[in-house]
Amino acid sequence: MKYIGAHVSAAGGLANAAIRAAEIDATAFALFTKNQRQWRAAPLTTQTIDEFKAACEKYHYTSAQILPHDSYLINLGHPVTEALEKSRDAFIDEMQRCEQLGLSLLNFHPGSHLMQISEEDCLARIAESINIALDKTQGVTAVIENTAGQGSNLGFKFEHLAAIIDGVEDKSRVGVCIDTCHAFAAGYDLRTPAECEKTFADFARIVGFKYLRGMHLNDAKSTFGSRVDRHHSLGEDNIGHDAFRWIMQDDRFDGIPLILETINPDIWAEEIAWLKAQQTEKAVA
């Protein structure tokens, strides 16, 4: 079964994220459990936790259908020790918040070397950051997102994801989230069914589908291989409809959150309905 949704706002309380997801007929959703542009947040109250869990139960969302995202400020591969420690502490806090909320996944961007250390050293720092966080938490899987490769961001090659996973001690609590816009901008073609087959054959060989714990379904304003991260609505730009139809018809993408981060929230309900319909359309050639 496909779990299809969007990254919804938690404004006014975390429980509102589940309510907003239900309003667009989503069977999955993503959210921030704190302000994503601030380092610190007040601890979760018992009331907030209880209300969130109650809303998820009311609208039939299990932890397998929810893909929280951490703060954009965190850089688990930071070259400077003091800044790295700050990011690690913030990431542990994000993992602990997920633990408190009964969530089992935390999606994050891997990190950036800032042109100060090698890619290899940065990837090793990211893996060690994950190890530290896993050691201090229980039940939450660290889900590494591929990136478009803007600036010095790592994670734009499948090999980067594989290297991080290789350095994580508890392989049962690490996974990946593939963002279609990021992959396309990083040079993984998705414009035709044949290109989708090739890209995900590479993914299967280098990373492995057993580590796929979520996806972000976004078309790309950015051009192929541009290393620029610019999302668009499904079928409206450089990737086109075929990739998303192909994903909907492949059972390797069952049972994980498939999350829209497309640019127009007003049409998320339409995009979700379209994605659901593709599961029973004539198979992509």
Swiss-Prot record:
Catalytic activities: Endonucleolytic cleavage to 5'-phosphooligonucleotide end-products
The protein's Enzyme Commission number: 3.1.21.2
Cofactor(s) in the UniProt record: Zn(2+)
Free-text comment on the cofactor: Binds 3 Zn(2+) ions.
Gene3D superfamilies (alphabetical): Divalent-metal-dependent TIM barrel enzymes
GO molecular function, one term: DNA-(apurinic or apyrimidinic site) endonuclease activity
InterPro entries, A to Z: AP_endonuc_2 (IPR001719), AP_endonuc_F2_Zn_BS (IPR018246), Xyl_isomerase-like_sf (IPR036237), Xyl_isomerase-like_TIM-brl (IPR013022)
Binding site for Zn(2+) 2: 145, 179, 216, 261
Annotated binding of Zn(2+) 3, by residue: 182, 229, 231
Positions with a binding annotation for Zn(2+) 1: 69, 109, 145
UniProt keyword list: DNA damage, DNA repair, Endonuclease, Hydrolase, Metal-binding, Nuclease, Zinc
Class of the enzyme per the UniProt entry, highest EC level: hydrolase
GO process annotations (BP): base-excision repair
HAMAP family membership: Nfo
Function of the protein: Endonuclease IV plays a role in DNA repair. It cleaves phosphodiester bonds at apurinic or apyrimidinic (AP) sites, generating a 3'-hydroxyl group and a 5'-terminal sugar phosphate.
Xref: PANTHER family: APURINIC-APYRIMIDINIC ENDONUCLEASE, ENDONUCLEASE IV ENDODEOXYRIBONUCLEASE IV
Family of the protein in this entry: Belongs to the AP endonuclease 2 family.
Protein name per Swiss-Prot or TrEMBL: Probable endonuclease 4
Species annotation: Shigella boydii serotype 18 (strain CDC 3083-94 / BS512)
